[in-house]
Amino acid sequence: MTSVEKASKACELCRRKKIRCNRELPSCQNCIVYQEECHYSKRLKRSYSATKKKNGNPVLESAIPSLSPSPSIENGSAMLNSDITSLSNRIFKVEEKLDLILSLLKNSSEPLDRTERKDFPSLAMQIRDANSLVNTKLKEYSRRFELPSQKTSFDDLFSSTFPNFDAAFKDIPDKEWAFENVQWYFRYINCWWPVFYEKDFMDEYECLYRDRNQVKGAWLVSFYSVLALAASRSKAGKDQKLAESFFSTSWYLIQKPGFFLTPQLEKIQALLIMIQFAAHVSLHTLCKALCGQACLMIRDLNLHRESANADFSNKDAELRRRVFWICYIFEITTSLVFGTPSVLSDMDIDCEHPNYEYGRYFSEMPTGDLIFSSEVSLTILKNEVRTKVYSRTNTSNARNREKAIWQIHEKLLCWERALPIELRQYFIALTENAQIYEELDFEKQRLFSACIEVYLSYCNTLIFLHRLNESVEGANICLDTARRAINVLKFFFIIPIAKNVCYLWVFLYCPFTPFLVLFSNIVNGKEPSTDIAFEDLNRMYSVNRFFVKLRDIGGDLAEKLASVTENFIHAAENYFAVQPAFMADAFDFASFLT
């Protein structure tokens, strides 16, 4: 058999640093992190069998004398090899033709109700769909008013910039100041996203101020990222610059050689904290890159396999599980927003769910595990929506897709019924618009605020699920769910709970999803009731107010989405203005925002 040469799939940087390459185009994850151009050379690597044949066995070659074949034998052997190669090529081509014929026969035997495959509705795709709706449905009225039909690209929404190394904060901050900010992190962040055991982290903190050389570099990355998160909660300009400086220090530390070379649990923890801050300052492309690196380390450490925890104590095994599930939530939700393939969704996951008994080791707020466990279960269902409803196999047949939709719908209802009693009573209050926030104490207000975010995430999941449901019932579920979600924003979230908003809001429950449902319903003229149409427009204003409110909290992305929603509201107003049923009504954008 002839030797086979295989093309090397890794880029030049990954081959040079001897690290795993995920082979993404136009740039792999490692090149994004190291800020280098990604090049895939045409270099070939010879297979083991070919190398062995070329090099031979020196011991045997020296022991056996070489024989010089006659010219006639050489010519005959060459002709025989040529005939064998030609026959092999012809057989291979015949097999290809047979496979093609069989695939055509299989396709012709399938039902004729094949439907076009649709990708999962990423944020950029949702905005493009709304733009397309403006261009098609309102085109006949273009002479009467100017339409905001400018396109919003992926690069417009998600900045691809990276931190500036010149702003790195290289000195250890004051101990008392750092202590207050670390305590804030464990009370307000780590309780919902349990990345660290509080006691273990504080032990390293004390060690840092005794002797910096005794602290691991990965923990130092986490320390500066925690300070960046804590400092960013202040609206003062100097604190914002200080937060960016802390994060730049973390970014500088992970650029050191060897950080991505060997996978460690401490490094994954550091990357998770950096992801949270990057989302806060709208560096969402950096979120995706850091998430990819964390997933590679998870795969190398087998955190997704419960059998890998057998050699660890119960406490350490629980920490490994929680780190995996946090990364799972981040990676699945970011891939849905970006519309990119997920790494962890294709893996065989058998990791156990978080154990409530260990919640007290992560934060003084024991109810934080209620939110975290609910997010884990809901994210699993989100991934199931994409893999079963938006996959190639199920979208090729409308009946299969509708069956999958209702099966997952039943699972979502079971998820809601199985919520802990503390969360279920808040879900009921949110559905009924019951004003209970002021009646709660401070800790319960925090839990209620977090429950609102879970509720909005649940609503978005229902909308994504029934977006492809062609039945009337599915369309009604989408519309009713969108109205309930925006009602929550309007009555509960904007004032006074916006100050407690999660830094990952765009990935977990971006309100543009229900906004698009109401906008499409209005512009398509599907709402026969004038009063309900006015109420839906008012709800759209509430989404715009949400983004305006989050400009100081959510960075540039919230400001861009505020501008986008304002343009679409303007288009909906103009559509109303040319309809006979609405000619007598006037709209004032400012009146809805006061």
Curated annotation (Swiss-Prot):
One of its GO terms (cellular component) is nucleus. It is a single-pass membrane protein. The chain crosses the membrane at residues 503-523. SMART domains: Fungal_trans (SM00906), GAL4 (SM00066). GO terms for biological process: DNA-templated transcription; positive regulation of transcription by RNA polymerase II; regulation of transcription by RNA polymerase II. Residues 11-38 bind DNA. PROSITE patterns: ZN2_CY6_FUNGAL_1 (PS00463), ZN2_CY6_FUNGAL_2 (PS50048). Keywords: DNA-binding, Membrane, Metal-binding, Nucleus, Transcription, Transcription regulation, Transmembrane, Transmembrane helix, Zinc. InterPro entries: AtrR-like, Transcription_factor_dom_fun, Zn2-C6_fun-type_DNA-bd_sf, Zn2Cys6_DnaBD. GO terms for molecular function: DNA-binding transcription factor activity, RNA polymerase II-specific; RNA polymerase II cis-regulatory region sequence-specific DNA binding; sequence-specific DNA binding; zinc ion binding. The keyword DNA-binding applies. Coiled coil: none annotated. It comes from the Eukaryota. The keyword Transcription applies. It is found in: Nucleus; Membrane. This is Uncharacterized transcriptional regulatory protein PB24D3.01. It comes from Schizosaccharomyces pombe (strain 972 / ATCC 24843).
